[in-house]
């Protein structure tokens, strides 16, 4: 049974659209021009490529980082991006229910007010057994520790993995896989950054949940009712007298 969550007031359409556009451009610049950003982009692009190439269906959607094609290599012919090909309010996306076979969300949740509603909308438009791949900056990391010193993160809400997994479970998403990326402090100088790359090997082995970013692969779990065969019904009917006897005995 699907659980319900407490609803909150939503921001206006203009606020949500403007916020996503502004942070998406900033994020792209940070990923391309900083040592930490370049490392994360390289690792996440590889992860996306490995996990979209075996996806099939009619429609795929990329939300965020629209200048970087992260759907490259998959077998789906019809691709959409937000906000490049279309302009969408992520709380009310202009797609039919259960129409998307693959959705990727590179660092979207951190920059959206009340991202819980976005998760609900993603669940609505995702086809049964469809796949979502999302990446998020981890609050329990170097990025979370120094978020007040990184301009990109000052207005962001870095994600707690445990809380996100709980929210996904409430929405009936199944987690099919995931990965952690980058354990280096966010140095501005490439030379300093290279000196601490050994933390990546140590982090993967000893403290993976403290990575600067993480990825999750989600599946839309659909419960299919099991039909009872006639022979099973006959077997069930033979139990009725004993069940009736049990009810009578309980009255005494």
Regions found by a protein language model. Give the residues of each.
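Acidic carboxylate diad motif detector
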Residues: 134-136
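A short glycine-rich, Lys/Arg-flanked "PGG" loop and its adjoining helix->strand segment in the class I
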Residues: 116-131
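Conserved catalytic loop of SAM-dependent methyltransferase domains
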Residues: 175-201, 209-211
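Class I SAM-dependent methyltransferase SAM/SAH-binding core
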Residues: 46-96
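Short alpha-helix
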Residues: 155-178, 182
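Short, glycine-/aromatic-enriched active-site segment of Class I SAM-dependent methyltransferases
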Residues: 138-155
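Hydrophobic beta-strand segment of the Class I
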Residues: 103-104
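C-terminal lobe and adjacent flexible extensions of AdoMet/dcAdoMet transferase-like proteins
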Residues: 199-252
